[in-house]
Amino acid sequence: MIATAKIVGYDGEVLIVKPLATIEQELLQKQVDEIEIRLTDGREISANQRRKVFALVRDISSWCGEEPEYIRKFTTFEYCITKGVETFSLSDCDMSTAREYISYLIDFCFRHGVPTRDTLLNRTDDISVYLYSCLAHRRCAVCNKQADVHHIQTVGMGRDRTKINHSGMEAIALCREHHREAHTRGQAFFDKYHIYGIKLDDNLCKILNLRKDR
């Protein structure tokens, strides 16, 4: 089960929380002795976040033909099931939940090939998660067209990309057009679009079929 609680004390080692609903029966029946804690920032969803959510919902609605309200409810439910969190309202959820939900909607668009009215770079509320998703789905971080992996550190002349360890290297997903622009303009390119390379972890290396030593 998922329960919400209020923090009532913390001394640096011991955290005391007060559940907002009675959970005694569940604790006794399941003999729970360990819990998972998810911290939120305490601030409510911003108007800008809400605009991003509804813009993404409208894009998905236009793509599949369902009403926006149905899409909002469906994606909210799927997000909560996937993340294992309580249902929430866009009227008063916290900013952390809104941020993660926006990232989920963006990933949904990438997974299903949903065409969007604007680049998802302008819709993201968490640039690092967005850049990771762009790499995972091979979508350009700038325009969202089909992309290749652009290494921030050059691999080097004469080196076989299939034989080097890519794990830990910084990379970004860019289409051919923006790949050329990145090579031509260098750091000015990244400053222009407010993007950057992220480190390839083992999961990304596996998804992208890049060699890793471990």
Regions found by a protein language model. Give the residues of each.
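Short Cys/His-rich Zn2+-coordinating modules
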Residues: 118-130, 153-161
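Polybasic, low-complexity binding patches
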Residues: 163-169, 180-214
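Phospho-dense, intrinsically disordered low-complexity tracts enriched in Ser/Pro and acidic residues
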Residues: 2-20, 34, 155, 195-214
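Conserved aromatic-histidine-acidic binding/catalytic patches
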Residues: 45, 89-97, 128-131, 162-166
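Short cysteine-rich loop/turn motifs with clustered Cys
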Residues: 125-152, 177
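Histidine-centered nuclease catalytic patch
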Residues: 139-171, 187-188
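General detector of N-terminal leader/presequence modules that precede the first folded domain
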Residues: 1-85
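Charged, alpha-helical interface segments at or near domain boundaries
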Residues: 74-118
